[in-house]
């Protein structure tokens, strides 16, 4: 998992409440057994004018010119600004995969759905909760200034705006540690690989019958 320390990026404003996971990555794209390739289909039903299916050549599909991510000023955005209850709906880890593979490193919103919120951390995508008043101000700034950027300093737990304003945010010490070091669940486990091997060797020596396989 990619480490997250300080990130500066263009902000894209998704001015909709209750954006659910089916909007983030529609159900037909969940058939893949791979963990990659979801970025081109993030927000598929809003992003394109036709119906998308797995395996299509997205470069040949008609884009929706009214959708925010198709507007030139936001096409290189890496910070998503959203409204309350972002990521609601069914539980699918494909949603943070799609957003991250699109190019987003962080999402700022007044609130997130719990499962989506947790899945973001597990996949190196930083969800930041600010107040509705703060988010409203950032929407206004994003609309007012072309190429509006924010700097997110995870170590300091603050979002810095170009006008000098700072927006502190909360994050647990464990989640912060994992993001700063690029540890997902597997990475955390592998840090203890030698202890795991030692335990397995001792277990096998003391209880060898547990390793026997039934035949027939």
From Swiss-Prot:
Entries under SUPFAM superfamilies matching the protein: LeuD/IlvD-like
Pathway(s) of this molecule: Amino-acid biosynthesis; L-leucine biosynthesis; L-leucine from 3-methyl-2-oxobutanoate: step 2/4
Annotated InterPro entries: 3-IsopropMal_deHydase_ssu, Aconitase/3IPM_dehydase_swvl, AconitaseA/IPMdHydase_ssu_swvl, IPMI_Swivel, LeuD
Keyword Lyase recorded: yes
Keywords in alphabetical order: Amino-acid biosynthesis, Branched-chain amino acid biosynthesis, Leucine biosynthesis, Lyase
Gene Ontology biological process: L-leucine biosynthetic process
Cellular-component GO terms for this entry: 3-isopropylmalate dehydratase complex
An example molecular function term from Gene Ontology annotations: 3-isopropylmalate dehydratase activity
Pfam families referenced in this protein's UniProt entry, alphabetically: Aconitase_C
Catalytic activity of the protein: (2R,3S)-3-isopropylmalate = (2S)-2-isopropylmalate
Domain of life, per lineage: Bacteria
E.C. no: 4.2.1.33
NCBIfam families per the UniProt record, alphabetical: leuD, PRK01641.1
Function, in words: Catalyzes the isomerization between 2-isopropylmalate and 3-isopropylmalate, via the formation of 2-isopropylmaleate.
Record note on quaternary structure: Heterodimer of LeuC and LeuD.
Family label: Belongs to the LeuD family. LeuD type 1 subfamily.
Protein name: 3-isopropylmalate dehydratase small subunit
Species: Burkholderia thailandensis (strain ATCC 700388 / DSM 13276 / CCUG 48851 / CIP 106301 / E264)
Gene: leuD
